[in-house]
Amino acid sequence: MMFNKQIFTILILSLSLALAGSGCISEGAEDNVAQEITVDEFSNIRENPVTPWNPEPSAPVIDPTAYIDPQASVIGEVTIGANVMVSPMASIRSDEGMPIFVGDRSNVQDGVVLHALETINEEGEPIEDNIVEVDGKEYAVYIGNNVSLAHQSQVHGPAAVGDDTFIGMQAFVFKSKVGNNCVLEPRSAAIGVTIPDGRYIPAGMVVTSQAEADKLPEVTDDYAYSHTNEAVVYVNVHLAEGYKETS
C-alpha cells in the first residue's frame, strides 16, 4: 500500500492541535525558543550566584595557558594557574566557600570535586573554622603547584594540599591540610588532620586523628608511588598544551 503524504500531514497537524489543547504542550514553549539567551548563561565557566552570605558575584581568573574542558565546571571566586589541566566532569565550585586556588602545573582529573563549606556568614563576617591559611593568605580550598588530583577524588574545604602531592583515585580530603610531597593512595581519606610533608596514606585507610597522621609512613625512594606524581604532572601539562592548540 502506497503511503499518502497528504493524509500523514493531516494526522500530524491534528495530533499537534490536540496536544496543545490538552495542555501537553506549554504555551510558553514558543517564548522559550524565541527568548534571546546569552552564552554566559550556559557557560561552564561563570560567576557564582548572589546569596545571603555572598552578595557579590565573582568570576574565575584562569591563566591563558590552562585548559578547561567544556564538560568541566569552574564557578565563582576561583584562581587557576599556568599549565593547569581540568578534565571532563570536574567541578570547581566556589559558591559557598571561597576562594578556591589551583596552582601552576596541577591537574584536576575526570570527576574531581573541589568545593567548600561556607566561609562568610550572612552578616559578612568570616567563619574562621572554615578557612585555611597558606603563606599568609586565606582560602576555602588551596591546591599547590604540581599537584595531581586523580579521577573522582574530592578536596572539600576547609582544606589545603601542598606542592608535588598526589591525591589518588576516589581519595578524600576534608577539614585537613596535606603537606608537600605526599601521596594519598586510592580511596584513602584525611579528615580533620594535618598530614606532615613526605608521608603517604595507604589505599583505603581513613585518617581521622592527628596521632594517626603523625605515624604515617614516609615516602622513600623505594616506595612504589614515590615518582608517580612527577609522571602524572608531566603528562597532564602536555595534555593541557595539546588541547589548547586544538581548541
UniProtKB/Swiss-Prot annotation:
Taxonomy, superkingdom: Archaea
Residues binding substrate, per UniProt: R93, S94, D95, Q109, D110, N236
Taxonomic classification: Archaea, Methanobacteriati, Methanobacteriota, Stenosarchaea group, Methanomicrobia
One example GO MF annotation: zinc ion binding
Main location (coarse class): secreted
InterPro entries, A to Z: CA_gamma_LbH, carb_anhyd, Gamma-CA, Trimer_LpxA-like_sf
GO CC field: extracellular region
PANTHER family: CARBON DIOXIDE CONCENTRATING MECHANISM PROTEIN CCMM, CARBOXYSOME ASSEMBLY PROTEIN CCMM
Protein name per UniProt: Carbonic anhydrase
Gene source species: Methanosarcina thermophila (strain ATCC 43570 / DSM 1825 / OCM 12 / VKM B-1830 / TM-1)
